[in-house]
Amino acid sequence: MPQPRSACRATALLLCFSVLTACGRGDAGSASAVTAKAEPGAVSATTPPPLLPVTALTGATADTLADSVLIQRADRGRLMGREDAMWVVMISDFQCPYCKQWHDSSMARLKRDYIDAGKIRMAYLHLPLSIHQHARAQAEASMCAAVQDKFWDYAEALFRDQRAFQSIENPGAKLEQLARDISLDMPSFTKCRTSDAIRSIVANDERQASQARVQSTPSFLVGDFMVQGALPYQDFRRAIDTALAVAKARRTR
């Protein structure tokens, strides 16, 4: 049972939050929920963390030179922010209602306050939960949008229309409609969606999440800390500010 708020030492546990704010894998085919929390990790703030969408680290497979280029472009397309800034890696599922809740309440403000300000570098990893019927197709389609440097626009559209996907059996037409809405090159997008290379990126994201014992969405690697759940923005800011302070203290030792 979720525990009530309590005081937490910043270097051991950034935040305690008493409501259910994350999608879990579920035991009987239905979504479970977990309590938002933050735990210390063991990564340097500005060096590549263990969860990172960079081709050299992910191991995504490329059978041809064209596939290799596709993977690199897709990987780069889901990064946002200065290269020397502290990493914040989001692990998410486009059909998870708590991921949408976090996105709708926090993403624009996070971009304004931290990404555009040069304080953090944002990356997105996919964890399409099996309880969400269309999450994998959405993840793969978003990486095809990333190839055209419109990952974040497509992610915005997927979260905006999340409810529409609940009532359709085949998501293909809806995925293409969203691609047209953001002016993607449609022949390229359609061809990309059949690419084994794109599938390998999403599959490898899942392997990375599993190896890091991430089982719920949204989860975030914030500098040295793993944060789980759709924290309110002010609490998420405190998590980032604490991680930034830890990184600064390490640099000045």
Regions found by a protein language model. Give the residues of each.
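C-terminal cap of thioredoxin/glutaredoxin-like
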Residues: 24-43, 48, 91, 107, ...
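Residue-level signal for mature regions of secreted extracellular proteins and peptides
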Residues: 16-17, 89
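Bacterial N-terminal signal peptides that target proteins for export
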Residues: 1-12
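Structural alpha/beta surface segment adjacent to cysteine/selenocysteine redox centers
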Residues: 84, 89-180, 246-253
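N-terminal membrane-targeting/anchoring regions of envelope/secretory proteins
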Residues: 10, 15, 29-32
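C-terminal motif of bacterial Sec signal peptides marking the signal peptidase cleavage site
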Residues: 19-22
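A short beta-strand-turn-helix
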Residues: 68-86, 114
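N-terminal low-complexity, Pro/Thr/Ser-rich intrinsically disordered segments
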Residues: 36-75
